[in-house]
UniProtKB/Swiss-Prot annotation:
GO CC field: cytoplasm
Transmembrane segments: none
Job description of the protein: Uridylyltransferase which mediates terminal uridylation of miRNAs, leading to their degradation. Has high specificity for splicing-derived miRNAs (mirtrons) and other miRNA substrates containing a 3'-G terminal nucleotide. Appears to be a major suppressor of mirtron biogenesis.
Protein name, as recorded: Terminal uridylyltransferase Tailor
Organism per entry: Drosophila melanogaster (Fruit fly)
EC number: 2.7.7.52
Length: 560
């Protein structure tokens, strides 16, 4: 039997296992039985996988059998040739067949003219030489199946005669089972593939996670009995004073000529946090409270880098991460004496937002209960990577504004006409803390039926919200605030700031727009993708349907 030289031997490497190829390429020089015949020793790249395959080949040489790829093709050709000779008398020849047979003969001659190395089986070779072949009778176990790509890949038979009959009859019954015809695959760019994936996802309804479903169909009273007391207690605990003192003690030596003050903010301070929530801290170094930076300046980043060194050298603090490239860079650290993780920044906007949320939660407790529930729902749905707690809180506020239960934020803010406005950059950050009776609003009693009813309507509302044309706008607090018109509806201070800083306008060309009610150029959901929004909408729809079902638990009819 003839085989090719070593450099062109494995013409169809995908047909064989990698271990088998490595074995024969390694041992070929000592397997040839003809004197003077040589074959190059092909050295594979020395990798962990290569060494593993070589070891396997040496341990199981009898299980790795050789067969030239042409052997199988020649076997099938001879089968067909013998069948035609037996069934056709006299044999027939057409111009196309004559051309193909001539090309086959020329190909065989070219192959033999290359002086292929002749290899003997082990039983005919000298001891230690020869190759273990696949036995000829094994070829009989391999059968072919022919399918037609023009007929939805329909199987037309296991013999060439049936395949020829199918073609000669011009594809009879091209789609006998009414299967959808698959178009021929075409080359797609990465962008086209991504667009196709996004389009396909839009037609798929994502099922609500089991943990979220269990919370929704379970006793709603348990959610608040477990979460609310903890959240309310975490607003003020002695550990915060210890953290503030230790932080000032740690950082003051690094900035001896600048006043330093620490402000606490975030979900722990507003009353919707839990024991695993981070404590957000704004460190004012050098009276920078009223300084606004759309993105952190080099000076701000330099301060944070200097602060990082103090955390690295401290025995009371453990540095977790330094997120320098974020819009608001933060240092994530853990205060070891209390075990509380802290997010430290040099931006005062978070503290200003927290003051607003505290006022709303205290004036309308229903808001706090709803935010605790949807925060827990968001975590169980694993949506927190794209939709933050602050974002979903603003959505709750906007929804209650539409129910005339909360005032628009614009109504609360004090304009600088009376010289009372507190500004951080161009943004008004203070507001009139009027009672709801002064605002003409009703304060609802937060009972379980009331909370559940508003939660059901909340999820139903945002399941049907037109995110393409409208935005969630707590600043204006009205329904159907159009994305195309929002910038013309804001006060002159916004227009002046954006005119001087065109790159700092609010990002409206996003799948989802939720506007910060204080920093008006900030879309807090700009990170939400189309698929993320579709998932959120699907979850809202399913949650609203589950909350629509009447509760069988008598405890849910009573207040806390």
């Amino acid at each position: 039997m003839r085989i090719e030289p070593g450099d062109s031997f494995w013409t169809k490497k995908a047909m064989f296992s990698n271990a088998e190829r490595q074995y024969f390429e390694t041992v070929r020089p000592r397997k040839t039985s003809l004197p003077g015949s040589t074959a190059p020793n092909i050295a594979a790249p020395v990798t962990k996988a290569t060494k593993k395959n070589k070891t396997m080949a040496e341990m199981m040489p009898n299980k790795l059998l050789y067969m030239n790829p042409l052997t199988m093709e020649a076997h099938f050709f001879l089968q067909t040739l013998n069948s035609v000779n037996q069934t056709t008398n006299p044999p027939q020849l057409d111009p196309h067949l004559a051309n193909l047979l001539e090309r086959i003969m020329v190909g065989i001659e070219s192959y033999l003219d290359r002086n292929p190395t002749y290899v003997l089986p082990q039983e005919m070779a000298a001891p230690g030489e020869g190759v273990a072949f696949v036995q000829p009778q094994e070829l009989q176990t391999i059968k072919r199946t022919f399918s037609c790509s023009s007929c939805s890949n329909r199987i037309v038979g296991t013999t060439i005669a049936k395949a020829v009959a199918h073609l000669s009859e011009q594809h009879p019954k091209p789609n006998p089972n009414n299967q959808p015809v698959q178009p021929h695959p075409t080359h797609q760019t990465k962008q086209e593939k991504k667009q196709a994936q996004v389009k396909a996802r839009q037609h798929i309804t994502v099922r609500l996670p089991k943990k979220a479903r269990a919370m929704i169909v379970g006793e709603i009273t348990n959610v608040f009995k477990d979460k609310y007391p903890i959240a309310d207690k975490l607003k003020v605990i002695p550990e915060y004073d210890v953290i503030e003192q230790d932080l000032c003690k740690l950082l003051s030596p690094g900035f001896p000529k600048q006043p330093l003050r620490v402000y606490k903010f975030g979900s722990r301070i507003t009353g919707i946090g839990n024991r695993s929530s981070d404590l957000d801290l704004f460190v004012d170094i050098g009276n920078t409270f009223h300084t606004f930076e759309h993105r952190a300046s080099n000076a701000t980043v330099a301060k944070l880098r200097a602060m990082r060194k103090f955390f690295c050298d401290s025995e009371d603090w453990r540095l977790i991460n330094f997120i320098e490239q974020a819009r608001v860079p933060i240092i994530k650290t853990c205060h070891l004496p209390t075990g509380i993780e802290c997010d430290i920044c040099l931006n005062s906007m978070g503290f200003c937002n927290t003051n607003l949320l505290k006022y709303i939660f205290e004036s309308q407790p229903l808001t706090q209960y709803m935010c605790i529930y949807v925060k827990n729902w968001l975590e169980r749905c694993k949506l927190t990577e794209q939709i933050s707690t602050y974002s979903i809180t603003l959505m709750v506020i906007y929804f209650l504004q539409l129910q005339a239960l909360l005032p628009p934020i614009a109504m609360l803010q004090i304009e600088d006409a009376a010289n009372q406005a507190v500004l951080v950059g161009p943004w008004v950050v203070n507001f009139a803390q009027k009672s709801f009776s002064e605002l003409g609003l009703q304060q609802l009693k937060a009972t379980v039926p009331v909370i559940k009813g508003f939660l059901r309507n909340f999820f139903a509302y945002f399941a049907k919200f037109d995110y393409e044309h409208f935005l969630v706008c707590p600043y204006i607090g009205q329904a159907n605030v159009e994305i195309a018109k929002i910038e013309r509806m804001l006060h002159a201070r916004y227009s002046a700031y954006v005119s001087d800083n065109p790159e700092c306008s609010i990002q409206l060309k996003k799948p989802m727009v939720v506007q910060d009610p204080i920093q008006l150029n900030h879309n807090v959901t700009k990170a939400v993708t189309k698929y993320g929004l579709q998932t959120f909408v699907d979850y809202c729809q399913q949650t609203a349907e589950l909350l629509e079902e009447p509760s069988t638990n008598w405890r849910q009819r009573y207040a806390f």
